[in-house]
Amino acid sequence: MNKVLLTPAKCALDMGDGSERGLYVNQDYILQKMKKVHRGISLMYTYYPNDKEWPTRACQIDTGRESTGAWDSPYENYFPYRGGREGLRDGEPFNFMKDIRRHGMDVVLTLTIDPHLKEEDIILLAKDLRPYGRLLLRVNHECTGDWFCYTKRASYQEIADFFVMVCRVMHKYAPNVKMILCAGMWQKSTGKLEMEDIFLEAHKAADIWSGDNYLSLHWGWPNDHVSKETANYARYSVAEVYEKAKMTLKRLRKITGQDKPMVLSELNADGDVAGPYVQSNMMKQFMDLLQKDKENWLSAFTFYQFRDDGRLGMEITDPNNSEIGIEQPIMNMYKKQLHKAFFSQKIIKAEGGSELPVTLRWGGSEDAEGIEVPVKFNRTPVLFELTFNDKLLPLNMMIEFNGWWFYKAPGTKCIDLMSYFYEKSNAIKKPGIFKLRYFLPPADGMNKPKTGDPYEAKDGDWLYNYYAELPELPEIRIEESPVCRRITHLK
């Protein structure tokens, strides 16, 4: 038995889960589909508390006229963020944030915000986010465009200055939050970033640099169809998009004199444009380029998204029942890529004792302590499960076995791991020792100080780390042949 440490992948993968184009899908379902955790799950919300229509969702506001586009509304058509002034911390997005963290992943939160809000409003948002560990926050993304509603309310300089103010507030009141600036990207025609002078100070203030770039996109959805008679869509060269993203980072390093992580916060191809098979092939080409590139320049990208009302998802929403998804060809391709070493967190031996009981630290999906146990198999088993006694029953646990991940919720007594062997490629070909690892993310999805209100408590280690004790190991039950061989004949 050893103590191990979960560390970053060469390129992390995040998953978009819910936006204006689709509902949130719970993490149990996604884990069952993917058989592996992501680094983070991306949520998208909007916040315009000064508007008279607030908090009505934009698509439900009666404007007295027919909508002409996806963003033809008073504010963006994401679900409303109900924290902040309202202080509703038990509903969206907080219930989903807790679900994400319980399942061993970090929260990646996008907020489009009224750029005329004051510092005191942002302080309220910062306090909302303090209990959620190492959280990534993207504010007013694609800010050099003209489609989002906030760009119609302020100048680009005002938008840039607003982002700098939000960074300053978050760093002071929620230091666990890292700020993502998703702004203009490199342009081949100029050799510069779009609006790089206006957003220079914002780039310097951000913790993480980002861009959004689709390999193909039908931006006319849902108001028109891709056809020879319409023009609201495009398909791009995968190689050119790759170069654009990479050159964006190089240009940012040059103009800021800084070096920060680079991510792509929205990436996919749109099945509406050239069909689902081309969608899958284009994304595979991009992911192959990343793995062949020795510079390892991209820290992470977010696949947008898991289930989509259009054709931007691994699943498309069943039009008869929004709780059901229809799997697309891209899911199988992406799942194979997700399990590759390049996109997987590394699990390495950690310092410190592993004697039981042991206290394990959960910092996040790229920094967490676990316990590793060797398991011997002579052949493919017919039964492989873990059982949890009364001491272990309350624990919230993520379990890793040979690259596959399983979740144990508080109160669950037994976890069946046999599904790993249902994949023909995972059959035991010769006797060997396999590694089983246990990690303990927060049971309620939140970090809390030993005493006091997490929204108001003093800064400390609790902002970044959650600790839980593993008193003993689960019982491992393995059967390599059927227990019952005798046939009982009916009388």
Language-model-derived ranges and their functions:
Residues 126-156, 179-186, 264:
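Active-site groove signature of glycoside hydrolases
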Residues 293-297, 302-412, 445-491:
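Aromatic-rich peripheral "rim/lid" segments of glycoside hydrolase catalytic domains that contact
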Residues 66-67, 74-81, 214-273:
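Glycoside hydrolase catalytic-domain groove-lining segments
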Residues 16-129, 293-295, 306-309:
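N-terminal carbohydrate-binding/catalytic regions of secreted carbohydrate-active enzymes
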Residues 41-52, 196-239, 304-309:
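Aromatic- and acid-rich polysaccharide-binding/catalytic face
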Residues 25-33, 84-96, 120-127, 188-201, ...:
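Alpha-helical scaffolding within the catalytic cores
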Residues 2-27, 33, 47-48, 260-355, ...:
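Substrate-binding cleft of secreted/luminal carbohydrate-active enzymes
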Residues 168-194, 257-272, 298-308:
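Aromatic-lined carbohydrate-recognition surfaces of secreted/lumenal glycan-active proteins
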